[in-house]
């Protein structure tokens, strides 16, 4: 399982939903766990029609689709699941309603191996999050 959550989600905060779920799952499954947690900065799954969303946030759906592709490769070709990680995006900036187009630099890939400063460590119910 891969959970993808936007760090800036103010209606379903990560600290009250995904992070506790990941911690609980680690207590239940321990080292056997196949759960991966991807937390995306500057992203939330609500509010795409709110003023300024385009300048301050990136689309979280893109990361849902990428995670689904990774899971498909895992199930059909035995590709390894990505490490749990923070994906650090870059807002587009600009004028609300007229943000520049998304570029690859705005929406980096989920990587197979997280950089040490982006790795989420889950152990014995504790979820250690990088800033």
What is each of the regions a protein language model found here?
Residues 1-131:
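C-terminal His-loop and adjacent cap/lid subdomain of alpha/beta-hydrolase
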């Amino acid at each position: 399982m891969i959970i993808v959550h936007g760090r800036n989600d103010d209606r379903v905060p990560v600290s009250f939903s995904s992070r506790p779920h990941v911690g609980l799952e680690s207590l239940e499954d321990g080292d056997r766990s196949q759960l991966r947690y991807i937390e995306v900065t500057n992203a939330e799954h609500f509010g795409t029609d709110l003023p300024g969303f385009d300048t301050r946030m990136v689309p979280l759906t893109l990361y849902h689709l990428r995670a689904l592709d990774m899971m498909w490769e895992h199930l059909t070709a035995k590709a390894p699941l990505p490490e749990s990680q923070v994906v650090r995006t870059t807002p587009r900036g600009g004028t609300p309603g007229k943000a520049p187009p998304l570029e690859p630099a705005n929406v980096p890939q989920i990587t197979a191996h997280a950089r040490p400063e982006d790795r989420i460590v889950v152990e014995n119910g504790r979820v250690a999050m990088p800033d």
